[in-house]
Amino acid sequence: MLKHSSAATKENDSPKLKVLDIVSKLEPSLDHSHTHWWKLTSPQLALMLEAADYSIEKQFETLLFHYHWVVPYLGPKPDADGNFKWRSLVSDVGIPLEYSWKWDTATSGPDVRLTIEPINELSGTRVDPLNQAPSLELLHRLAEILPRLDVSWASHFLSTFYDHDKLKYIKESESETGMPLRSTMLVCFEFGRNGITTKTYMSPRKLGQQGFAPLSDYHSAIAALGPSCALDAVTEFLNNSPEGPHLSPFMLAVDNIIPCSSRLKLYFATPRTSYNSIREVLTLGGRLSTVTLESKLRAIHELVKAIMPFPPDLPDDADIPFPEQVLSPTVQDLAESSDMANQRPAFVAGYQYYFDIAPGASLPDIKFYIPIRKAQMNDQAVATGLTNWMRAQGRGAFCNAYTRVLEGLAGGRDLSKCHGLHTHICVMLKGNGEFDVTSYLAPGCK
């Protein structure tokens, strides 16, 4: 059963939740589902904002935004047996929300973000088989209060990634060989110190498709935006690197701002988990190089060792063994299973990367996602490994606050008995040699 910190909503429970107490008192309940999701998520978000040292004003702004713009789009609450009308793939507990904690840098404190799959009563029905209407409605309405919001790129990919005959999607999903209806569109909210911004995530889904879409579907849609040297560099890498055949695309994301300022992030999964594989991808086969690059890559690998079930003396060219209950996936497993939900255990056991290939860039920025194998690593072990690594980088100022966040998400359970609060830890090596580090966190653990 999912555990969460319902106790955090009690009146005068803690001074740090005073902002939440005020918002909860003054804002009326909208309906039973809204009340359910608010009671589950608002104490968690309030705790994260306080732990990240947001100002009181920003805490009010963010919680009010969450109340009016996020919670109403989390969909119908689960029934008495815990079943969801539309089961989102955002988290493996079915809740259509994931938090992220972007760690502090030399010049800024942590940033709190969350990603949702907007859902309503018609999600997965003949009216909206791919569950995209709630996301579109949300973005359209947000344009009225977020003046920088621009959905030009999201609209472009929406028009190219999907077929328009909704009834055929329903009929296909009901056939013996058709792929079940699954999540295809997510919205991320970044609660920055200077304002709220959004991103849209999409996974292509064409009629007749089995599993994740091929790279060609992404390539043609991206190429239609104009020439991209970064895309050309990634394509050349995939065609010529020994790691290329192992990388399978699964998602694309854009910032909802004017295209000339937006990132265009193409996500890949791979079953390969060796150090040599990390090095090959993060250097784009040697195309990216600096004097200190090797030492930085070794530091990233030390983080891998700290939060993964890493065997002693594993050679640089060897993959981390997969858990017994998850057979080592092949690229074909990742790309061709008829149901993306069935791919999840193998999918999250390997590494993930994104390449920022926005037009105008000569080479892509690359971010590396380390999966948390929750069957093998409890959340206390992950937290200890991560915070020790952050302290070793001279960035330990918020480690204790981060642990408090985890304890809140665990709802009072011992972190050593929790598996699944951490979903991924991601790292990007910036041009100045500093690491961007982000923790992705579930809204509870089983």
Curated annotation (Swiss-Prot):
Pfam families from the UniProt entry: Trp_DMAT
Example of a GO MF term: prenyltransferase activity
EC numbers: 2.5.1.-
Record keywords, A-Z: Transferase
Binding site for dimethylallyl diphosphate: R113, K199, Y201, R263, K265, Y267, Y369, Y440
Disruption phenotype: Impairs the production of the xanthones shamixanthone, emericellin and epishamixanthone; and accumulates variecoxanthone A.
GO biological process, alphabetically ordered: alkaloid metabolic process; shamixanthone biosynthetic process
Pathway listed: Secondary metabolite biosynthesis
Highest taxon of source: Eukaryota
InterPro entries: Aro_prenylTrfase (IPR033964), Aro_prenylTrfase_DMATS (IPR017795), DMATS-type_fun (IPR012148)
Family assignment from sequence similarity: Belongs to the tryptophan dimethylallyltransferase family.
Function statement: Xanthone prenyltransferase involved in the conversion of monodictyphenone to the prenyl xanthones such as emericellin, shamixanthone and epishamixanthone. Monodictyphenone is first converted to variecoxanthone A via a paeciloxanthone intermediate by the consecutive actions of the FAD-dependent monooxygenase mdpD and the xanthone prenyltransferase xptB. Variecoxanthone A is further prenylated to emericellin by xptA before being reduced to shamixanthone and epishamixanthone by the dehydrogenase xptC.
Protein name, entry field: Xanthone prenyltransferase A
Lineage, uppermost ranks: Eukaryota, Fungi, Dikarya, Ascomycota, Pezizomycotina
